[in-house]
Amino acid sequence: MAISDSSYNELAKQVYNVEPSKAKSNGDLVIVAGKTVKDPITKRQYRVLLVQDNNNDAHKTNDNGMQAMAVAPIVKGDIDTSQVVIAYAGTNAADSRDLDTDWQLLIRGNQDDLVSGNIDGGNFVIAENQLRSAQKFYQQVKRKYPHSALTTTGHSLGAYLALIVAAE
């Protein structure tokens, strides 16, 4: 069964809830692997297979603000990993790393590492850019589910990441 436009849209909305503070501000539960998310229009359910939240990663080099999740539809009670959707979160205006990514990656076209903070004052962090993190997450999903048809979705910055990753 094909994944509907409304499901892609809902997954692109739900991926923001991978980040705990965003889930809290949305009044939702944090999305973790094993959770089920639902498209309210089609009533189709999806099992969350993998998540990545680079806002809460222990490795500072990953601290770039990228969030993503991989889901598979639940068909007749079974998880159908023949098709997996990777959803990327878009810009969170309250997250300076997302705003820095928008500036560096989308506006300036700079695909080098992400530089966040006060560069002139010497108080800055260099982290992998979100596009590289998105590509790595895609490869991780592809390795774990090698026989799956992978598709991507996202809004805003997440749509950019989804389009570039899918085009590669």
Regions found by a protein language model. Name each.
Residues 13-14, 18:
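Substrate-binding/charge-relay-adjacent region of secreted/lumenal peptidase catalytic domains
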Residues 2, 7, 21-152, 168:
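A conserved cap/lid and substrate-binding interface adjacent to the catalytic center
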Residues 153-158, 162:
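Gly/Ala-rich beta-loop-alpha elbow adjacent to hydrolase catalytic centers
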